[in-house]
Curated annotation (Swiss-Prot):
GO terms for cellular component: cytoplasm; cytoskeleton; nucleus. The gene is ACTL7B. Keywords: Cytoplasm, Cytoskeleton, Phosphoprotein. This is Actin-like protein 7B. The keyword Cytoplasm applies. The keyword Cytoplasm applies. Its main location: cytoplasm. Residues 1-42 are annotated as: Disordered. It comes from Bos taurus. The lineage of its organism: Eukaryota, Metazoa, Chordata, Craniata, Vertebrata. It comes from the Eukaryota. It is found in: Cytoplasm, Cytoskeleton. The modification Phosphoserine is found at S8. It holds the Pfam family Actin. Belongs to the actin family.
Length: 417
């Protein structure tokens, strides 16, 4: 029997409004323009009245942050943290030890670059603390003790993650209230739905997560340890095989090439038969040099369908999804899931990917008529879902206050998150 995992309220209805309309929120509570009253805590109204909750989505590439009720994040902050090498510092050195966000562009000494997440899971909590300090004091310029915070939690993460987030935010930053909830649940809320199969592929990891009536089903969830970062590395490899000389120091350039020039071919075998002149595009490097990019434009995306191209024996994303659908059949959810396959995450933003994914999944599940949806703003689906959720009146009772955490410890987290 599939296990369920959810304590969040279930917003009903379909998405309304235009995500690009300033001050308008898509989703079940479309039209919310001022969340100053919507984010009051019923438990401790005197401490968090007239404030906006801070919504955060910490991903492998970027941390998205902004206020509840807004249609999109205020800031995208790099999840990479720079630490000075110990041998580069001495007792009289007054320069910074840790660099986050735009500080990495103005570093005063050689830095060791650290990504505190591996496959979406936090592995370095000291760096996470540095990112939070940057969010509160440099990016948002707010006093943390005046704002409730909603944090997203990736699928299949250790349950101890939620406790660690609570300890960090309550004890180090003194926030008045917080809530941690499933990344996939927030993604489905961004679609204005409570049931569906969430196919998430960001920078560091991909997941296929079934959700039924607002309940996450972790026992049926699938994970693949490849995503957008691997696609970027594969593009670098392909470009070098074509005669270019890029290194890991140029990954930011390769990332830009991927976003501007690359696409997912509906039928790659037909693309291979095209004249190279029809495929080639010129790309101007930062130094002004022009390079031509041909078949690499669509070849790089093939690793999402054939991970063996990058040395992985894991199934491609459509196969991973089809296998998850088959497990849902045993649990009695297959028809519901197949009718609502929802693409989320930055890696799915590649031109042509939704159409190719739909085609491959339909070939794998011919009798299920899978319906794939791809929202225009799906790159920030987790954050948008958090913005919706924290604005719902029904959600306000699920904030965990600092006083509750001090009195009950982790039990307060697990009873509401």
């Amino acid at each position: 029997m599939a296990t369920r995992n959810s304590s969040s309220p279930k917003p009903m209805g379909t998405a309304q409004g235009d995500p690009g309309e300033a001050g308008t929120l898509p989703g079940p509570d479309a039209g919310i323009r001022d969340t100053s009253s919507a984010t009051q805590l019923k438990m401790k109204p005197k401490k968090v009245r007239k404030i906006k909750a801070l919504i955060t989505d910490l991903g492998s590439q970027y941390c998205k942050c902004g206020y509840a009720g807004e249609p999109r994040p205020t800031y995208f902050i790099s999840s990479t943290v720079g630490k000075r090498y110990s041998e580069a510092a001495d007792s009289g050195d007054t320069r910074k030890e840790t660099y986050v966000g735009h500080e990495l562009l103005n570093m005063e000494a050689p830095l060791k670059l650290i990504n505190p997440l591996k496959y979406g899971i936090v592995v370095d909590w000291d760096c996470i603390q540095s990112i939070w300090e940057y969010i509160f004091h440099t990016a948002m310029k707010i006093l943390p003790e005046e704002h409730a915070v909603l944090v997203s939690d990736p699928p299949l993460s250790p349950t101890s993650n939620r406790e660690k987030y609570a300890e960090l935010l309550f004890e180090t930053f003194g926030i008045p209230a917080m809530h941690v909830t499933s990344q996939s649940l927030l993604s489905i809320y961004s679609y204005g739905k409570t049931s569906g199969l969430v196919v998430e592929s960001g920078h560091g990891v991909s997941h296929v997560v079934p959700i039924s009536e607002g309940d996450v089903l972790p026992g049926l969830t699938s994970r693949a340890d490849y995503a957008g970062g691997d696609l970027t590395n594969y593009l670098l490899q392909l470009l070098n095989e074509a005669g270019h000389k890029f290194t890991d120091d140029h990954l930011h350039i390769i990332e830009h090439i991927k976003k501007k020039c690359c696409y997912s071919a509906l039928k790659p075998e037909e693309e291979l038969s095209l004249c190279l002149e029809d495929l080639r595009v010129d790309y101007e490097l930062p130094d002004g040099k022009l390079i031509s990019i041909g078949q690499e434009r669509f070849q790089c995306a093939e690793m999402l369908f054939k991970p063996t191209l990058v040395g992985s024996n894991q199934p491609g994303l459509p196969e991973l999804t089809a296998a998850c659908l088959n497990r849902c059949q045993e649990a009695g959810f297959k028809e519901e899931m197949a009718a609502n396959v929802l693409l989320c995450g930055g890696c799915t933003m590649l031109d042509g990917f939704p159409e190719r994914f739909q085609r491959e999944l339909s070939l794998l599940c011919p009798g299920d008529s899978p319906a794939v949806a791809a929202a225009p703003e799906r790159k920030t689906s987790v954050w948008t879902g958090g913005s919706i959720l924290a604005s719902l009146q029904a959600f306000q009772q699920l904030w965990v206050s600092k006083e509750e955490f001090e009195e009950r410890g982790s039990a307060a987290i697990y009873s509401k998150c």
